[in-house]
Curated annotation (Swiss-Prot):
GO biological process: DNA recombination; DNA repair
Binding of ATP, residues: G114, E115, F116, G117, S118, G119, K120, T121
PROSITE patterns to which the protein is assigned, alphabetical: RECA_2, RECA_3
Signal peptide residues on this chain, from the entry's feature table: none
Function: Involved in DNA repair and in homologous recombination. Binds and assemble on single-stranded DNA to form a nucleoprotein filament. Hydrolyzes ATP in a ssDNA-dependent manner and promotes DNA strand exchange between homologous DNA molecules.
Highest rank taxon of the organism: Archaea
Entry protein name: DNA repair and recombination protein RadA
Organism of derivation: Metallosphaera sedula (strain ATCC 51363 / DSM 5348 / JCM 9185 / NBRC 15509 / TH2)
One Pfam match: HHH_5
The keyword DNA damage belongs to this UniProt entry's keyword annotation: yes
Length: 324
């Protein structure tokens, strides 16, 4: 039994499946079987034909993929036990942590959406620092990967936040790996490479994409490009969610908003990305400007958390509770 559990943990990608060498891997990839999920739902005949392998080998590969993904019915008690091991990263504000059920969760995607200057990037910077704190201080003693699509990542801000927490700024910077994504294809390619990077360094506990939609929105404008954009965005988001689930890490994505001219009452802004982005993130939080350095966070959607609003502040030292 222990050997089966260990084998399940070892299988992370298609190339980890027994009997899948480089030649078979190349054939599977060319035929569209590049993920464990695609293999798990394939028929033995299709897989055998695509990779040029015997039916019995295809059956074994499919079974291994299904076992690795733990595709089976589970009791509610098993699911509760799995949920109990989910970890949280503090945001720096007790009020915001409370809204999130204790902080930014691992094994899921948290979306922060709001207008320009609302504080989304500030939260991303803060959590990239806080993930490095020990568990007793609200962190995971881990590292962060930061995908910057808008050129807003600032080391000066990271150092100020680190110093405020009594951390060595240079060490904190060393534990944050950042890359500037220059367009949609580059952004997608970066995420596709993340699995290899994270598999080699299990101390990575946070992935940030700031922002998830800016390149998609700029490059796929117009109704005629909407279907292609949504398909690419959907696949991109699911790759990130899969990383969160496999490697027990937190994923934060930020998103822009746009005005709806048909709204005559209430908040006229909605998140960019349509239904694709409404359904994929496990937790969706809207960030709004308030007076001065205060911001309002509103829980929009989470299956296990109630709707609500809290106020927090963006200070010189980082994200903090709002002073009364």
């Amino acid at each position: 039994m222990a050997d089966q559990v260990e084998e399940k943990k070892r299988i992370k990608t298609v190339k980890d499946l027994s009997g899948v060498g480089q030649a078979v891997l190349n054939k599977l990839t060319e035929a569209g079987y590049s993920t464990l999920e695609s293999i798990a739902v394939a028929s033995p005949q299709d897989l055998s034909t695509a990779a040029g392998i015997p039916i019995t080998t295809a059956q074994r590969i499919i079974k291994e993929a299904r076992d690795a993904l733990d595709i089976r019915f589970k009791t509610a008690l098993e699911i509760e036990q799995e949920r109990a091991s989910v970890k949280k990263i503090t945001t720096g504000s007790q009020a915001l942590d409370g809204l999130l059920g204790g902080g930014i969760e691992t094994r899921t995607m948290t979306e922060l959406f709001g207008e320009f200057g609302s504080g989304k990037t500030q939260i991303c910077h803060q959590v990239s620092v806080n993930v490095q704190l020990p568990p007793e201080r609200g962190g995971l003693s881990g590292k962060a990967l930061y995908i910057d699509t808008e050129g807003t990542f600032r080391t000066e801000r990271i150092k100020a936040m680190a110093s405020a927490l009594g951390l060595e700024p240079k060490e904190v910077l060393q534990n944050i790996m950042s890359i500037r994504a220059i367009n949609t294809d580059h952004q997608i390619a970066i995420v596709e490479e993340l699995q290899d990077i994270i598999a080699k360094d299990n101390s990575i506990k946070l992935v940030v994409v700031d922002s998830i939609t800016s390149h998609f929105r700029a490059e796929y404008s117009g109704r005629e490009n909407l279907a292609v954009r949504q398909q690419k965005l959907n696949r991109h988001l699911h790759q990130l969610v899969r990383l969160a689930e496999i490697y027990d890490l937190a994923v934060i994505v930020t998103n822009q908003v746009m005005a709806r001219p048909d709204m005559f009452y209430g908040d006229p802004t909605v998140a960019v990305g349509g239904h694709t982005l409404y359904h994929v993130p496990g937790i969706r939080v809207q960030i709004k400007k308030s007076r001065g350095n205060r911001r309002i966070a509103r829980m929009v959607d989470a299956p296990h958390l109630p709707e609500g609003e809290v106020v927090f502040s963006i200070t010189n030292t980082g994200i903090r509770d709002a002073e009364e």
